[in-house]
Amino acid sequence: MLDIVENSTNGFNVIRGGMSYKHNDLRDMSLYKAYAKFERIPVFANEPVFDTMENLSDYSAVFNVALGRVLNMRPISKTYNLVSHQSAFDEQAKQIEDSNFDDRRVEVVDRLFEDGKKAHRTVYFTDLKHDINSRSIDDAVVPRIDIYNSIDMSWAFQIFSGAYRDLCRNSLVFGGQKAYHQKRKHTRGLDVPAMIGKSVLSLEMFDAQRDLMNNWARTILDAESFAHILRNTLCKKPEKKSADYIRPDARPVNEKLLEYLLEQFFEESKELGETVWAGYNALTHWSTHTIEARGKENQKQHDIRRKRQDEVRDVITSPDWLSLCEVA
């Protein structure tokens, strides 16, 4: 079902099933601060034989601090990745500010549903326009990024970016085109910064090089060909003397990174097919996925991200990549 967005006022508005708030500040989290601040609390069960309360240590209830009440929902397990709405949207704001969209005017629509358990944020880049194929006189649509999140296991964490008029959570968009879409369950492996980073980078490319992006989305790339490109670029180690190798014929390849990128390529291919666009998204996932570097001495996340983006740029401008994509 399509979301109904009210456009008439600039305060908190009542919409079907919840509340909405329209504003122009990526850092404005007032709706979530007022209605959706969560924390885990213990769950106890009554032991009937001895009439005692037992702590279910592997599960938690969720307390809405903003509303001062326990949410009516199933307990969540200790492996459930409880992503707060505010932390996800703060991360999005930071990455947009670090992107080519940092000086663009935005319109933000925040929505909360069911006592704050579900959230949907849309960021419109209002001074950008893209034409779409239609019979109407006004074919221009505004590029946007949509994020869906829940804290009660009802919605997966899901991101769309592109230029389209409407969308629904079953991955369809209407009146336009997606640049990026991905959804993940709230498991320990959910990497919110990486997903947000890919949505922003994909929209940047959609805005600046839409024809190239469409070419990549149509061009077939199998895992073997992708691995060949990686061995000659990103995963290629510096040259060493043959005496440094246990086997003189061993190829100087970072096998761990190669395996990681191929695994990510398989994940991207589930949504995008075995295409060059899936390969590019696997590369951008790595360039924005810096969790493994957190806490290391003298390593700053933004520096790591910039360095990796430069390395991705080297891959997509390499002879193997350009030849595959038939880009002059």
What are these regions (language model features)?
Residues 90-328:
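Intrinsic disorder/low-complexity polar-acidic segments
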